[in-house]
Each structure stands twice: as C-alpha cells, then as structure tokens.
Amino acid sequence: MSAFLNLYRNTLSWPLSFLVKDNPIPNNPVEELTLNIEQPIVYVLPYTSQTDLVVLRKNCLSLGLPDPFLDNRIEGKVLPRYVFLDEGHQFFKSKGAKKETEKVFKNYLELHRTSADLDVQVVPVSVLWGRSPGREDKGLPKLRLLNGLQKTIAAIWFGRDTFVRFSQAMSMRYMVNEYGEDEKLAQKLPRIAKMHFAKQRISATGPRLPNRQAMFNKLLQHPAVLQAIEDEARGKNMTKEKARKEAEKILNEIAADTNYSSLRVADRLLGWLWNKLYQGIEVEHADRVRRLALEGHEIVYVPCHRSHIDYLLLSYVLYHQGLVPPHIAAGINLNFWPVGRIFRSWGAFFIRRTFKGNRLYSTLFREYLGELFHRGYSVEYFIEGGRSRTGRLLTPKTGMMSMTLQALQQGQTRPISIVPVYVGYEHVLEVDTYAKELRGAAKEKENAGLVLRVIKKLRNLGRGFVNFGEPITLSTYLNRHFPEWKNEGRDERPLWFNKAVDAVSRQVMVNINKAAAVNAMNLTGTALLSSRQRALSREQLLEQLESYQQYLLNVSYSDDIIIPSAPPKELLDHVLGLDRVGILIEKDNFGELVRLERNHAVLMTYYRNNIQHLLVLPSLVASIVLHHEAIQKDLVLTSVEKLYPFLKAELFMHLPPEALREKVERIIAELHRQQLIKLNENILSINRPRVRTLQLWSAGMREILQRYLITVAILLQDPAISRGKLEKESQSIAQRLSVLHGINSPEFFDKAVFSTFIASLKDNGYFDTSGNADVTKLQGMADILEHVISTEINLTIKSAVETAVDLDEIESE
C-alpha cells in the first residue's frame, strides 16, 4: 500500500508543482507562531486528502518546516508527522481517520508522560482552494470537501489562489501538565483542532455576500428609514412612493457590489502594479488582525490616508495575509466611469463629502453601515476624511466613528475592534500634485485618464509599508474610560457619546503614529532638510543617518514602529537609486556632496513629516542644549515639560505626561552615548567636535518652535485678541517668515496647525475664564522659545507682530 501511496503522491506532485503557487499564511510561521523546530511537529488536516497533503509538503519545504511525509522518531518509536481529522473523498481508503488520529495522539501523549523534555507541537493546517464565501441566494460554496474531479478543477482554476493556513500550535506538554490524568485527552485534541478549522474558514472567507436587492428591501423597511422617507415626502411635498424611489436610488449610489471573481482579477492586476511601481511591500503585525478574526471580532480598519492607492494596497495585503478584504468607504469623487464600478465590485461603498441637513441620506448611510456590521463584514474607512497633502496626520473627522459607536450602542452582538493602520511609501504617486496644490493650484478632478497618466510615468518608487497598529476593542475602551455607556438607552444620544467619539478617534491617530514605518527616504529627507542649504557632504549625511538609526533603536518610540536594519550606506544608495527623488551627487576638491534640488524641497518635507513625531523630542533637547551651549539638566527637563503638551496634541504622540521625564532622561543618555553632548554632573553642554550633528538634530524642531513663538508673541502684544483673528494673524506672519527666510515646509503656515496650538493653549490654562491670555504663563513659554530660536528669526517675528498690532490700531481708529 505504501509503495502505491508514494507513487500516487509523486504523480500528484508534478502537476501541482506548477499549477499551485506557494501561499503560506503566515509568510513566516516559525517566527510568527513561535514554532520550535527542535521539538517534534504534528500537522493536523481537517479531511483526508493526499492532494492537500502534497500541497502542504510543498509549502513546508519552502519554509524550512519539517517534511510531513517523514515520520517523527522519538525514543525509539516511529509516529506519523501528520493526521487527518475526518474522512474525505479519497482513492486510498483508511481504517477511519478519526480512530487513526485518536490512536496517534494517544501514543504521543504517552511519550510525554515518560519524557519530561518532550513537547510535541500540534499545528492545525488547512488548504484553501479559492476563497469565495458564496452568495446568500446561491447556497454555500464547496470549500469544505472536494472530490477528486472538483479538486482537479480547483487546482487548474484556483491554483494561484490556493492558501495554506497554519494555525497557532497546541502544546502537548501543556495539555499533559494540565489534564494529565484525563483518559479522553486524545479525543479532546481533535475537537480543539476542529474548532480552529471552523474559525479559520470564517476568517479566511468571511460571511456570504449579500443579495443586493434583498438587502435594499430590508433596509427600506427599517423603522428609522421609513420615518426618514415619510419626512422626505412631507418636507418636499412628494408622494411616499417617490420618496421611497429616491431612497432606493441613494442606496444604489452608496452600496458595494462585491464580486469574488472581480477580487481575483484585482489580485492579479494589483500584483502586476506593485511589481511595476514598487520594490516590495513590507507588512508587519498582521498576526494581530488574524487573531481578532479568529476570535470573531467585527473588524474596522482605519488607515492613515496618503494616496488613492491606499484603498487597493490594504485590500491586497489583507487578501494575502489570509483575511477577508473589507468593505471600503470611498469618497464619491472616485465614483467615475469606469473606476467607480470596478471599485464597487472590489468592495467599495461610496460616501458623499457632506450630507449635513440631508436626513434621508444620513439615515440610509448609517443603517447601511450598521447592516454591514450586523452581517459580520469587515469595514475600512479613512478617518482623516481626505489624503494628507503634507505627510502629517490630519485632524480626524468623526462622522464614521460616530456611526461605528452607534452600532455598538444599538446592540451589536459581536465585539467591534478598530485596527489603526499605518500606510507609508518611499514615494507617493500623487506627491507632485500635492506640491502644486500647496502652492495654490486648483485641485484636479479625478478621472480615469488622470490615474493612467500618473501610473504610466512612474516606476522604481522604492518600498511600500503596511503596519497594523494596536487594536482598540470598543467595549473594552468604553468600559475603561466611559463606564456609564452601558447604562444608557439604545436610542438615546447620551452625554458621554460625543466625548467618547472624540477620544476613540484621537486614540486611533495616536496608535497609527505608534506604528510608523521608518524608511530610507524619511531619514535621508530629514537629514538634508535639516541643513539650511539642503546639502551635506556624503560623510556627514551618513553620520547623521547612523545617529538617527541608533537613537530609534536605543530609545524606541514604541514597540510597533518599523526601523530599517540596513547600514547607512545602503540606505543612501537605495534612495539615490530611486526615480524622481531630486537628490543630486556633486563632486568638489573635498569629496562628494549630496544635494536636494530646490524644487524638490517641498516634496521631501512630505516624507520627513511622516516620521517627525518620532524625532521631535530629541530634536527639542538638542535645540535647547545647542542654543544655551551649557545648561542644567533640570532646566532642560522643565523646558521640555512645558512644551510637550503642544507637541503631543499637534503630532498625536502617545507618551503620557507622567512618563515624559524618564523618556527625556533616556534621550539625554543616548545623545551623551553618541558623544553629541557632554554630561558633567547636572550640566549638559555641547561637544564641539560633534556639533554639526547636534545642529542637524536641533533643526528638526526649528519650524515648530518658530510657529509657537509667532502665536505667543501676538498674544503677549494683544491678550484680548479673538481666536479667529489670532489664527489669521499667526498665519499671515508665518507666510511672511517663510518668504523672508526660505522656509519650504507647507504646514508652516497651515491654519489648522495654528488652530490646534491655540486650542492646546486653552486646554493647558493659558487663557483665563474671560478668554484673555494669561500673560505671565505666556511669558514663561516665550522665554524658552526665544532662547532656542536664532536672533535673526526672533527679530523678524517681533517686527512682524509689532507691525500687525500697529495696523490693527490704525484700522480701529
């Protein structure tokens, strides 16, 4: 029998080797599932299938995992390295998979009772031939059990979409230690494995796709929708039937029309696109999401928004991580022919930019979103509302988050978890367009021709990054911060609600920044922009890159960030090898200079701003020490403590105030270790041989501190100034400063940044109850700021503020 079985397997191996692509999930099971390959492994498959076993073996060999065809040899006993839980459609009949498996498990368990060092790892594995969830009106897909003919067809049709899913290993040592005397333990192990397979199947395929019209009919019968239709008919003096047709038209505009075949085409197309544009996509912490999916959570992906391709990239990554691509909230501006129809088939549902005052639309959209949650579909939306033109996170728009919390409040049975996602690129497709818009050009309307023109002229754009941040399970978060949420009625909008929406939205942004991906472009751009001439010698640039890397490794911002491991020379060579970066190499008698072209300076600020929050605190410390030359450490700590609340609000930083002092101590220790500063008892001073590196570090805070001083100086001159006027004058002076001193950062005179700073001043007690500025507190901040800003900039700000105040006095006379 074994000879025939081996012949059969060898016969299967040849066609499967080219029909079926290796798609293991996760990509590195040894690391992600913490498998110990020094200990025996037993693979558990759900059904008897030699085809599945051959595909498993192919993947195991490519991953460096033990060969399932070879037996485990333990203390003189020979036991199989794989088992099947149930019978399948098979050519070679067995004595009964269930009994054989229980017997194998029993033998392994007995070995554990006699060998204290043994720990066999039981790894459930399923082979997914295609990932179609089926449709509500067409019954269940044949995912569970395929006969020989069906599997042949599956190998031909779905071979490139076959995934081998490895689950978390079960430790037999743990089972024996916990349940050693249980005679039925060998029977319990298969049952536990079956539970894994059931969860795997749901997390990989998701719920069945809806019958769109049936969903519309259900939504149109919802009491809230019926009331909105009635109000629409009454308010616009039309019949209820006409109002109902209008409601159905709106639903048709909103709703996705997901099609699995279309998703498969998208996978091929996007795979080609990433290979054309980028050198690879780095994905981190996807295990968090897989864990949530296996635990049955309703998952809401909330990525930062850099580019239109964010939609596509995240769905592509999730599909290849063994997860269901989500329903994506896309702006109505993307609903143009033919892209809108294509995106809709890939899971996009469309949302208008504003629907304030349109009760029928808002009700239908809210109920549609609630229905997606109720049916168990994962959802994705961009909380910033639009793409960031500056590379910084934008202030969150809370409408979608409000609807998400309403779904929880109205009795959503499954736990809802928000998954913040950091999406980063070494080159953003639209960055040239962003630069034009920031210089005042009108926003170009999206169309198919524009998209194709952008893609056609771009290639060799470096790497892309998708990093899944720390999830926020809403019920857990609300229990901790808003415990009263459970005591309110479902249909009410209680007092805690708006505060909770704002708090969760901000926490999402904080967690996105905690998952930042540092790359060669970020670091190189930060260093070059720190030089006033946007040029450095190659040696100085490499030294600065190494300093950044060492800091990020030794004083990590968070456990979630991605830090490049390549040496500085490789990072720089990588950036120089990319297209359209605007970095030139020039040679003189002293060696090579690396220079950033002037017209690319604004573009490079985009990439610097992606990681500015990671480097802002050491930049502040460096700036304080540099401008004082020698200063007491306690004064440095006090200065940082005064400025940190404003940095925290502006840059969505996560460090709580009570942990700040310890963090600054670590920063000082690292700067001292790098010999950038001297530390003599309680005195910090500059180390002159390394002063250039310290100057480049300090430049990372230069523009932020200048902005703060502009607003503080205006308030000191006119403590009773209105908030609107304060924002306007701050912006005007910043624009003047940027022209006079060649400041290229587009966010330098962004009104929203000044608005955030002014709101933070209010939150931190810099205004009295009458709305007037507290001059004494502001003067204390001004003293800090004036000491870390050059005399030239100080004089320009002072002169501009005095001129603005004089003009106001003339206008008021």
Swiss-Prot record:
Pathway given for this chain reads: Phospholipid metabolism; CDP-diacylglycerol biosynthesis; CDP-diacylglycerol from sn-glycerol 3-phosphate: step 1/3
UniProt GO BP = CDP-diacylglycerol biosynthetic process; fatty acid metabolic process
Topology of this chain in the membrane: Peripheral membrane protein
Keyword tags:
Acyltransferase, Cell inner membrane, Cell membrane, Lipid biosynthesis, Lipid metabolism, Membrane, Phospholipid biosynthesis, Phospholipid metabolism, Transferase
Major location (coarse): membrane
Q: Which InterPro entries match?
A: GPAT/DHAPAT, GPAT/DHAPAT_C, GPAT/DHAPAT_LPLAT, GPAT_PlsB, Plipid/glycerol_acylTrfase
**One GO CC term of this entry?**
plasma membrane
What SUPFAM superfamilies does this protein's entry cite? Answer: Glycerol-3-phosphate (1)-acyltransferase (SSF69593)
Query: What subcellular compartments does it reside in?
Result: Cell inner membrane
Q: Name one Pfam family in it.
A: Acyltransferase
* The reaction(s) this protein catalyses: sn-glycerol 3-phosphate + an acyl-CoA = a 1-acyl-sn-glycero-3-phosphate + CoA
Give any GO molecular function from the UniProt entry: glycerol-3-phosphate O-acyltransferase activity
Domain statement? The HXXXXD motif is essential for acyltransferase activity and may constitute the binding site for the phosphate moiety of the glycerol-3-phosphate.
What family does this belong to?
Belongs to the GPAT/DAPAT family.
Which HAMAP family does the record associate with it? Glyc3P_acyltrans
- List, alphabetically, the NCBIfam families matched: plsB (TIGR03703), PRK04974.1 (NF003441)
PANTHER family for the chain: DIHYDROXYACETONE PHOSPHATE ACYLTRANSFERASE, GLYCEROL-3-PHOSPHATE ACYLTRANSFERASE
Protein name as catalogued: Glycerol-3-phosphate acyltransferase
